[in-house]
Each structure stands twice: as structure tokens, then as C-alpha cells.
């Protein structure tokens, strides 16, 4: 009975620090979350493998028995920029391919290759107000929200937003794109 109570104590009280928000998404988690949220069905698995390899996660060539370094190595400034560019492409309904990664624009230049158009959608409450939809997406995809980011999101999805209008999907996708570019989206 003593060992049982000790084991119970260890399992219930072992670690007081909350682990959420302390880990950076690895490239696979990142791209799969994007494709799932945007409900992309026709993305080529080899493109996902190529993307995560470009991000430093070669699935079939781990650095050692332990696996990948993880942690902060998943998010250098170059990898963060590449993630933002991929998010832009997908949120604009453009499929990614190998040429995309070789020709990613720098410093706001236009992308010079033609990309296949894909259908994207974000699930949201069609009867919700702008603040309800912002909260819904923030709760689903962000670890924490600060006041400045909240104001920026409210500038994207304005107070007079009508969730039942025909352009509501594009507005919510713009909001999602903004969310994906925030540092908080990179955290688990």
C-alpha cells in the first residue's frame, strides 16, 4: 500500500511546470496542422517530405539514434521565413511544389513561378461575431494571446464582419494566415 501511494504521488505531482507552450512545433507538426486547418486534401505527400527535409527533418535519415535535436533548432530565422512563405502560399490557395522551395522570394519579392490552385476552407461558426471567431481560432491554434495581437486580429476581422456573407471565408483565411505567422503559432 505504501508503494502504491508513492507511485500515485509521483504520477500526480511529478512535474509542476506546465509543458504547453514550451516546445516548438517540428516541421511535420507544422505542415500537417496547416493542411488540416485549411482542409487541403490534394497535397502530395512527397512535397510534405521535401518541405520537412528543407526544414531540417529528414524522416529517413535521423542524425543519431535519439532522433533530431528539436527544440530551438526547429526555428531559425531562415526556417521561420520559409514557414511564413509556405503559409502564404497555402492560405492563398496555391499548392506547394519543389520549385516553390528553390525559388522562394526574399524581401517581399513576387513569386515568379505559376502554382497549381487548390481549394481551401477554414471551419468556423457561420453565426459567430468577429470576436467569437477570433477567439475560436486563437484557442485552437495559439498558445497564448497578448493584447497587441488581439487588436491586430480585430483589425483583420472587423467589428462589422458578417460570417454569413459570401466573402467571409476569405476574411477568416486572412485571419488564419496572420495567426500562422505569429511566434505563438510555432509553439505547442
Describe the role of every protein-language-model region.
Residues 1-188:
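Flexible, low-complexity segments enriched for small/polar residues
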Amino acid at each position: 500500500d505504501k508503494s502504491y501511494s508513492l507511485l500515485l504521488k509521483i504520477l500526480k505531482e511529478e512535474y509542476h511546470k506546465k509543458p504547453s507552450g514550451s516546445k516548438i512545433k517540428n516541421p511535420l507538426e507544422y505542415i500537417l496542422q496547416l493542411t488540416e486547418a485549411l482542409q487541403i486534401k490534394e497535397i502530395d505527400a512527397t512535397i510534405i517530405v521535401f518541405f520537412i527535409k528543407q526544414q531540417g527533418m529528414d524522416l529517413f535519415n535521423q542524425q543519431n539514434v535519439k532522433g533530431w535535436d528539436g527544440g530551438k533548432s526547429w526555428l531559425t530565422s531562415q526556417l521561420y521565413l520559409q514557414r511564413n512563405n509556405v503559409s502564404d502560399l497555402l492560405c492563398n490557395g496555391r499548392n506547394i511544389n519543389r520549385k516553390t522551395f528553390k525559388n522562394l522570394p526574399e524581401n517581399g519579392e513576387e513569386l515568379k513561378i505559376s502554382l497549381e490552385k487548390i481549394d481551401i476552407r477554414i471551419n468556423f461558426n457561420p453565426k459567430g461575431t468577429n470576436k467569437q471567431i477570433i477567439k475560436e481560432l486563437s484557442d485552437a491554434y495559439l498558445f497564448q494571446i497578448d493584447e497587441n495581437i488581439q487588436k491586430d486580429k480585430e483589425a483583420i476581422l472587423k467589428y462589422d464582419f458578417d460570417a454569413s456573407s459570401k466573402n467571409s471565408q476569405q476574411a477568416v483565411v486572412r485571419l488564419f494566415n496572420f495567426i500562422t505567422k505569429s511566434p505563438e503559432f510555432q509553439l505547442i
